[in-house]
Structure formats: structure tokens, C-alpha cells
């Protein structure tokens, strides 16, 4: 439940108590929870070469909160491709860091899991010992990669698609403007509060 709902609440450490298969299941549940069951289902239908029914299009319309059926299948394809691109970039950048401490295959799996977890804002990790990313707190590359995945994943697919189509802020939809403004404000306020209340050196 925690994985699908991407709440990050766990009673046991994922790395210490789950096998590779168990970790893969958790990663899959996180991905499904982040994308949405409907988007994943439509993606599987498209991968099988079948047509999406009217009922399926209605479900996607409600799940993605769009106003029209026009371009619905293209929208789902864009969502899936966007997810693959962001998480793929996260895997490559994370691997550059994890490969310094783990064997290549293990580092690759950690990178894949970490990118899925970060982009979907799930809070899970497979580093063991409930350490999360504490051992890598001084790694600028990994921290920037993780923050980037979390922020872009939090913005949402529709906002990112809107930005890709309308490069100027004033041309964006009201929804995108509100999301971007709120995100920027929360990041700024959170940063200033941490600086003011915590013993940090930056």
C-alpha cells in the first residue's frame, strides 16, 4: 500500500528484508502508483498493438484531469515517454556515483530503483540500514540528480508537457502557472527556514 500510494512509510528496511524480486515488485508498485493504474493499463494495451476503447479513454480523461478526448492516446504515450526519459537520465547520473562503491550490476539496480523512487516521490531506498542517502550527503551530483527528479516528478506530466509546448511563462495554462509559482515559493521558503533553524554551513 505504501509503495502504490508513494507515501514512503515502511516498517522494515527494503534492502535488508527484501530479495531482488521483492525489491523489483516494490519498484513496480511505485511506478504504477506514480503513473497511475489507468495510464499503465493503457500503455500495456498500446504495447500489445490493440485499440483503446471509449471506456478506456474516459478513464484516462478522468485520471489525467483533461477536458477533451482529443489526443488522448498521444497524451498517454507522451507521459510514458517523459517518464522513461527522466528516469533514464536519473539512472545514468546516479550510476556514475553508485558505481564507485558497488559492483556494476548492483550499482545499476540501485540506480534504477533510486530513479524510480525519486521521480515518483516515494521515499524508498535500497541502500540498507535505513541510511537512505546519508552516506552520499556530500555528493553534489547525486543530490542534484535526486532533487531534480523529485521536483520534476512533483510538477506533474501536464505541467511539463505544457512547458515543452509553451516556452514562455505567460503562455502557460493557469494550472501550470499556479503549480510552478507554488513550487518555487515552497522551495524558497523551505530553503530559508532550513538555513535559519538548522546548523548548516551553506
Where are these regions (language model features)?
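Membrane-proximal intracellular helices of multi-pass ion channels
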Residues: 1-202
Amino acid at each position: 500500500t505504501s509503495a502504490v500510494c508513494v507515501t514512503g512509510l515502511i516498517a522494515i528496511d527494503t534492502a535488508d528484508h527484501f530479495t531482488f524480486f521483492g525489491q523489483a515488485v516494490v519498484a513496480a508498485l511505485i511506478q504504477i502508483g506514480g503513473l497511475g493504474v489507468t495510464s499503465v493499463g493503457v500503455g500495456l494495451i498500446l504495447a500489445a498493438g490493440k485499440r483503446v476503447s471509449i471506456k478506456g479513454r474516459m478513464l484516462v480523461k478522468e485520471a489525467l484531469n483533461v477536458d477533451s478526448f482529443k489526443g488522448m492516446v498521444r497524451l498517454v504515450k507522451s507521459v510514458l515517454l517523459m517518464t522513461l526519459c527522466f528516469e533514464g537520465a536519473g539512472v545514468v547520473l546516479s550510476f556514475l556515483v553508485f558505481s564507485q562503491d558497488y559492483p556494476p550490476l548492483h550499482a545499476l539496480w540501485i540506480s534504477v530503483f533510486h530513479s524510480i523512487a525519486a521521480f515518483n516521490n516515494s521515499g524508498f531506498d535500497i541502500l540498507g540500514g535505513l541510511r537512505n542517502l546519508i552516506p552520499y550527503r556530500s555528493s553534489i551530483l547525486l543530490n542534484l540528480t535526486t532533487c531534480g527528479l523529485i521536483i520534476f516528478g512533483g510538477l506533474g506530466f501536464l505541467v511539463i508537457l505544457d512547458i515543452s509546448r509553451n516556452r514562455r511563462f505567460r503562455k502557460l495554462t493557469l494550472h501550470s502557472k499556479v503549480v510552478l509559482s507554488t513550487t518555487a515559493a515552497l522551495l524558497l521558503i523551505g530553503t530559508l527556514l532550513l538555513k535559519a533553524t538548522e546548523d548548516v554551513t551553506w
